[in-house]
Regions:
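PRPP-associated nucleotide enzymes
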Residues: 1-293
Length: 293
């Protein structure tokens, strides 16, 4: 098996424990990109690692996948640690583009390798996204629960409460709390705008307990900060924040850390923005290796 990676995902690909391939990249003055697969892939099982973190990353993932298939790959496995636009999985207003569905259709249109294509995604914001894929590509949804549970036990200590940032993640947090055999707490909020929310209540009173807050992603950090403030006001002692995807848009990591609410913040390496000063990062490479190697 030969493993390739798009730009900014080389470290994660190298941690899978398999042979890695070489790619030549060039950027021309007019903004056009040149990509070339340097290794022989004919009749080989090939893995391509890359998250659809932005337009450039999405197009590079698509272009390299096409090149690998056209070069004769026997099988093609896309490892997508972070699936962008996962919060835009449905249209709310007439005329809205369902971006998650469009991305799924785009990746479904990659030419078929000799023995088929598959895509492995991690902790999707919406469980319905795999159903958007079309044709012969096989979608798989991998969960980071083992990594999250290990982080929660390590950082939370002997006794802690697992908290959510909102009621929308309540079922997932409750399931995780049951596995960890700890109590769960929930924050209820309402959304004022696209990035602005208001906390309305906390499900339980807290008396100095350690609270480990879990969310699937940290973007600007506003939801996490609002939840952290609510847990503090409800009487929480130590506050730990854990997320699968450290997107950290708009200087989100600095905002979360500068809030002074959290004793520790931890994420996985599913997103290239995860590596931030003051943030604990754990790799999801073993999860993917167990799934595809």
């Amino acid at each position: 098996m030969l493993v390739f990676a798009i730009d900014r995902y080389e470290d994660l690909a190298g941690s899978l424990g398999a042979e890695t391939g070489r790619i030549t990249r060039r950027l021309f003055p007019d903004g056009e990109h040149y990509l070339r697969v340097e290794d022989e892939v004919n009749d080989r099982d090939v893995v391509l690692v890359g998250g659809t973190v932005d337009h450039d990353a999405t197009l590079e993932l698509y272009d390299l996948a096409c090149a690998l298939v056209e070069s004769g790959a026997s099988t093609l496995t896309l490892i997508v640690p972070y699936f962008g636009y996962s919060t835009m999985e449905r249209a709310v207003m007439p005329g809205e583009s369902v971006m998650a569905k469009n991305r799924a259709r785009m990746l479904s249109s990659i030419p078929r390798a000799k023995l088929g294509n598959q895509i492995v995604m991690l902790d999707l914001h919406s469980e319905g996204i795999p159903h958007y894929f079309e044709g012969t590509i096989r979608p798989f949804h991998v969960y980071a629960k083992p990594v999250i549970e290990q982080l929660a036990r390590e950082l939370g200590g002997a006794s802690f409460i697992l908290g959510s940032t909102d009621a929308g993640r309540a079922k997932w947090v409750e399931s995780l709390a049951n596995d960890l055999r700890v109590p769960a707490a929930f924050v209820y909020k309402r959304r004022l705008s696209g990035e602005t929310t208001e906390v309305t209540a906390v499900s339980t009173a807290l008396k100095g307990e350690t609270v480990v807050i879990y969310d699937d992603m940290i973007r600007t950090g506003s939801s996490l900060i609002n939840a952290g403030r609510a847990y503090r006001e409800a009487g929480a002692g130590r506050l730990i924040a854990i997320a699968t995807h450290g997107v950290f848009a708009d200087d989100g990591a600095r905002r979360v850390l500068a809030s002074g609410l959290f004793d520790q913040v931890a994420v996985t390496d599913s997103h290239p923005n995860a590596q931030q000063e003051g943030v604990i990062v754990r790799s999801v490479a073993p999860l993917f290796a167990a799934s595809v190697l």
